[in-house]
């Protein structure tokens, strides 16, 4: 398009959404949006739970990232995002909370725990998504998903938002 900006969209969150799009267009939501040229300048998907192989190929080719929202997807019974598959295919994954209407707790530590825990159960593999990958999803990849390119490391001249974590709190002691 004339604006040459990335497009970000809630997409492929529920099976029903994907089925209805296939019925109306003959394509998945990702394929349909791609056919309209919406991903010519990159962008991202929020949720990305129900995809087929062609969807992954489009995302990889068009440099589309995904923001997974595990607590929201659990609350709304949307499904579990294929995070391990995204990582294996080299598609950047960030972690989000979706919002208070679909997630009762906007706690990123909870989201991080859910990302890794759900993938372990789905793949029956305690190392399905390593902790280092989850930390990257919650930090650097979040910045990437928002189009921020000057906050990937702690260094002079780079931007940074920092938090302090009380390691004496029981729930944070595993940090």
Task: Describe each model-derived feature in a short phrase.
Residues 172-174:
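Conserved small/polar residues in nucleotide/adenosyl-binding loops
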Residues 48-52, 72, 148-149:
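Short beta->alpha connector loops
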